[in-house]
Amino acid sequence: MDDTADAKRREDVFSINPVVGECNDSRINEICNRVVGEKELYHALEQADTDFAEGDIGAGTGTICYGLKGGIGSASRTLVLDGKTYTIGVLVQSNFGATRDLKISGKPAGEKILERIRKEECGSSAEDRGSIMTVLATDLPVSERQLYRIIRRCGVGIAKNRSLHRPRKR
């Protein structure tokens, strides 16, 4: 972390805010083995960039969403305010949901998928035992109150996908 901080300091970056989280991938990984160590941490820091792989990669490898393959994805928007361009970005790691609850474009799709899976005698997720992580980042010059209002939209997005969220207590 020291090397990263020193490098960023030279680039006039005044803050480094690493995000560490967990989404259970015990379906494919023995989590008690602690296979991620210092070497993997430094490799991840070296790979950090504005362009990055999404889907079934890295932290998204072992995720399951609605009983189907989950992953990691992002979306961002830019806006111009007082002649300056700012970005709002969201990173989501999906690892939740029972297949029967899946909707596509607002229409129930999970039961049809389950029927097909049952015909092929494959496994599926009958119940939701997962989690979801959402990270929102921005360089907008906002107050704490404004930032909290923006962040609350992450919970709304999660709720629209029939999952639960617990916002921090104020």
Where are these regions (language model features)?
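Alpha/propeptide regions of enzymes that mature by internal proteolysis
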Residues: M1-R170
